[in-house]
C-alpha cells in the first residue's frame, strides 16, 4: 500500500528530527536524490542516510521541521515548511537557527525520486554569521547551480 503525500511528509520530518537515516532514506527511491541548499546533492539511499546523520546531525540538534499546505498530484508534491534547530557550529554553538521555505518533491511509485528546497537563504546566512568572503563563495555556488539549470536558458539572454 502506497503512503499518502501527507504520510510521506510526516515520516520525512520525524526521521529528520530523530536523526534516523535508515527511516529517512527509505522514503526515497533507490536512485533518489536529496538536493540540499547548503550541503549539495546526495544520490541514493546510502548517501542520503549519511547526509542526515553525518551532516545535519553533525552541525545541529533539536530539530523541528513542520510542513504546511501540502499539495500533490501523485508525481509532484509541494509543501511550505518551517525548520529550526540548535546549531553545533563552534562559533555559534547553541544558537537557535530558523529557516522558511518550500519543499519540492518529485514522486515515483509512492516514494521520493528527488527532493529539493526553495529556501530563504539570505536570512539563514545572516543567522549562521558566515564571514563576508565565505558568504560570497556560498552564494556564488548557489548562483552557479541556478544558472546551470537549463530551465533558466531563456532568462540568460
Regions found by a protein language model. Give the residues of each.
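Glycine-centered flexibility sites
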Residues: 19, 44, 101-103
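Aromatic side chains
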Residues: 12, 28, 34, 39, ...
